[in-house]
């Protein structure tokens, strides 16, 4: 639903959290009980580091066969034939009938389900077992469901000293008994299937001996890993050894991820099942064209290289729904019907969708190029969409806020209407979609509430969720995001108007359908523009996690996946020590050299460390397995030349003693990035370029996130000894660089000027060499980078990257300058930490700051910038600033009583509700407001007002508030390094003395004032009802009449231009403008022009000839 700038999608609400994760989660075992069609479970907090499997039993989500047969009987045959046009291409005969051909497909989603052991593939097994399901697409576009058997969940513990085969057997019996007690409701014949003695080594700390004995504990079902881990960690009595508690290893890895690691499968790669190694499914369980069973050991996983780096033709469905809300209420599934669903289906890599349709409740006029399907009842609309999903069989479902709004709304609405068969939207036959509330918590992304909608076999890609994770924007409404990335806006129809359009005629419903289609089209445009599919598939390939993990989980799972893969190669195991960071609890962060604030009119060279933190970890061999704890250092008696002592006091062995795993991972990532960038230069094919660019970006992000993984104290494997060592080396290098630059580049050393380091950030230093041309600064920058790089251990390298000229340094992490990489012309104006786009800033601040920086940096005109500020402040005080520039917008995330303190936008929403509940903002809407004049001492929340109400009633705004609370701080930050008395110069003086205040027309005391006519010439009060001019202005009729006519004509032209602009945005020049996008400046200009034009016409009517 997309009303009022995605108002219908609760704009500004927290983003969606985990979508269908690769390891399905519903019930922790026990006797399966069928849930209701859209069971909404409680909201667990799914922290990014918290990884637990929950077993879904195959029978619990399945409708009975005869029940499904009855439901299919009443399907509309005409509709079925209409939908069948969009089916996938038919399977070739040899695949459809036999198993004589290899099956290769690109996998998109991996999950598991609990079912009976396969009698043919596993003749010696019985009882429930985990069956992995891999969903994917072949090169020809055929959908595949591959059911993988025989892979068992397991974990490790350290084997106690002196434990022999007999002891292990007794331990097995004891553990089996404890597991039986803990899982009384389970019908599994054996909980602990076997315990094997293996030789492994822990990843933690340097250990000279090659390996030591571990016990590999194999259990029956994935959830039993957590149950067994709990028993062992709490303590268990072992005959001959007494009571003992164990540290477990690799016991917190999701089952699907464990399978992928052991089978060398990465997210989004190509998998092949050889001919003769698979069986056609005896009982068809999915809607996929090809369903087969095989053993996990028979799968062939291809590396993403050559032909296997290409993309399959995925089917991507982008959809949007519209709901008819009651007056004054945001749509709720318990009351408000779904009235339209727009769908676009595109093949991955193609520019245009091959399916464009809209399903409407009641008749709808035709739309060019769109299949319009009209239905008499809401039930028919919902079932038609369910059938459409089944026939089109999309691999990826996208939209804007679909995980939190559209999909849950459809499921809950079907439940209200008792349409039992609707929630069968996944790829498993008759399996209902499950919805549950979730809360995702991560240090990087914060706490977010969402809904987990499990659509089996289909990846849900919510563009809102992706935007909030990957970009920092002032607003995340679809309108605002589209304007930012696509350079186009869309018509915003407030949810209060949608019901009126629906209840009109087929033409008004067509208007709504066009609007709905645009809201389905824009997410697809954004997906293509931002190369999301390429980038996310490449990130999944690089990090080895399923694609769905990238949206539903945080950063640490990606590093853990790479660490587990490398550890498996080295025969190492990873302990489960979550949240138990060793060593000190905190460490000193990166160095930021003191900023010498000022306006620099000579070129400033920037020297950057290439991948600083990864380089430090590689150079000094910093890893879990190379760390020597203080107590071990004394015992091992390592010679000083064999270890690195870090500036923070830690000890790590050098690579010639033992190479670290983290440095190896980083070397491979950065070498792969170098190859990808080299291939990118050579590549000509646009699809190949997109894949390679996505890959090099994924490799860069992955390398940079390794350091953060070691420093996450609540992460999977925290090690503050590593992270504190990295930052201490970083600090040392920044200070070393500063010293070398200032010691070498001096007049005594033969240079023209003494170099000066004016600022140093985490991984870069800014140097003023004193030369006056960009070209000379570039030469010295390159010389300095080469000279200093030679003093560091490889691969640490200082690079010259750019020149800032001129450069405005405000303070730490706040600066602006012209960015040069070519001495002929600057690339762009670069700013950091300067609030040009903040949610609590009005547009006037952004425009003012941007224009000032342009005048100072590009035009080199500081007096011009000062004069521009003075003129703007004067215009503000004289009420000459367009109201749209003064609008502040904030999201209403909860009701007024739920806020701890009174907020301007919340109080305004309450006042607007009292005026007109039908059009007032509701929870999820963004509330625009301006600050108006009020009694002295009134709080800001008492002075907030609706901009439209202000326009209609001529209410004066409070320019002093904007000057003091919005404009002054950003301006002073820019001008204080340039002007001596910036505050006195800019904010005081003659330009601030003249203030204009408009008279309210219908509020306060003006409600009781008697209005009198004034002369149209000199504004003097005149008596009589029909007079136009006073006695003194008689004789000037022609001049004043022409002036009035000219004023009306000008305002009509202005209004016409703005109206046409809005019509072009809505896509029709023949219909009224309904848009109420309060994020859009044109909206307020149009309203003001309309009001001014009406007032001017009233003046014109007073001329009576």
Swiss-Prot record:
Binding, Zn(2+): 1015, 1018, 1030, 1033
Keyword field: 4Fe-4S, DNA replication, DNA-binding, DNA-directed DNA polymerase, Exonuclease, Hydrolase, Iron, Iron-sulfur, Metal-binding, Nuclease, Nucleotidyltransferase, Nucleus, Transferase, Zinc, Zinc-finger
Cofactor(s) required for function per UniProt: [4Fe-4S] cluster
GO cellular component, as recorded: delta DNA polymerase complex
Catalytic activity: DNA(n) + a 2'-deoxyribonucleoside 5'-triphosphate = DNA(n+1) + diphosphate
Gene3D superfamilies: DNA polymerase family B, C-terminal domain, DNA Polymerase, chain B, domain 1, Helix hairpin bin, Palm domain of DNA polymerase, Ribonuclease H-like superfamily/Ribonuclease H
Predominant location category: nucleus
Region (Disordered) location: 1-46
Name of the featured protein: DNA polymerase delta catalytic subunit
Taxonomic path: Eukaryota, Viridiplantae, Streptophyta, Embryophyta, Tracheophyta
